[in-house]
Amino acid sequence: MSSPVSFGRKRLASALAAVGALALVAGCGSGDGSATGGGKKDGKTVITMGMFGVMGFKESGLLERYEKEHPDVRIKAEIAGDEQTYYTALQTHLAAGNGLKDIQGIEIGRAKEITETQAANFADFSGTPGTDHFLPWKQSQITTKDGKVLGLGTDAGPMAVCYRKDYFAKAGLPTDREQVGKLWAGDWKKYVEVGRTFKKDFKGGHVSYMDSVSGLFNAMVYGYPQQYYDENGDLIYDKNPVVKQAWNLAADAADAGLSAKLRQFQPGWDPGLANGTFATAVCPAWMLSHISEKAGAANKGKWDVAQAPKGANWGGSFLGVTEKSPVKAEAQKLVAWLTAPEQQAYIFKKLGNFPSSRTALERDDVKNVTSAYFSDAPIGQIFGAAAREIPDKQVLGRKDGTIKDTFTQGLALVEQGQARDKAWKTTAERIDKAVG
């Protein structure tokens, strides 16, 4: 039996800055607003947490449940709406050596910097019992060169292709998600070829095949072990054939007029969803909530989800425990519980945050999850399959986010008509300047 899921509260912090100041919320009872590190108080263990966006632990009621099951524990969670604001404060506290919470959230874009420069400030989970259930590539993202595991995975962002069934029908293309997936199985070039067919045969006004070519570029790059950096931390984007192949294919799509030129999460993209301006968008699991919200009730059942040509990941976070926490052992126990397969499956059903635990992916309460908005697509199975396809090791870099954004801007130049070689040169100059 399938289980429908609603995505109304899914976290977008890893892709878009949510508005909001720091808000102090307690798992139970009322906080005094001054908590930093926890400790022992009134016979109870107080554990403090610093998080961002909607990581799901407070919103799903898991913190309250843990307190009920462990009456000697009190959890005080401070949540920032904006991850950038949160991380800036975390860096300040790390440099000062005070003001840290016992548990700190770590966004994937910060993982490399944490493992390279802050390993001494975070506890090692490598020997913690019951933490061997994560997807290998997820665990590798937060592991130091000498094998320390500085956090445990919360969610992940495996990618698929979201598409408009009604538009595919008007282009004479299959609409069944399995048949659609077969159109481009194994090769992103096939995805672009389908776009050429769509543009040629679509009947029903002006509709672009894809929202922007940068989504295609990101999906191609994120599906490989090495992207912008090598294992030594050296920049290789200009030498990595994967990056250049992705650039050229994205440029081919732009030159063919397949793009609506609407960059994801930039002005114009939301109206594009509402107005049905494009037929496909490369979508990580967490993006479904945004699409359903912005495309609106009028488009429910018109969208569907198909397997992407290759597995890739965009997004995800971790929970780490600070090394000098006065309740380090208790905090590690809480993190292990919050990120266990059962709790990851629960948050997925409640909020849509996709599990990073390979054991969770095998659970029926994940595999059987469907999305009513996306034509009852079996999203648990689709995104689970994508997560398993991702290479076991992914090499992250300290400036991955900056480089990704710069490539997005460079491809926008191509969409606007600039020659790809000139746009590449401009992009490379901007990257070199940004990363030093």
What are these regions (language model features)?
Residues 102-105, 279-284:
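Paired acidic/hydrophobic, glycine-rich loop segments that form the ligand-binding mouth/hinge
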Residues 107-160, 302-304:
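Hinge/lid segment of periplasmic solute-binding proteins
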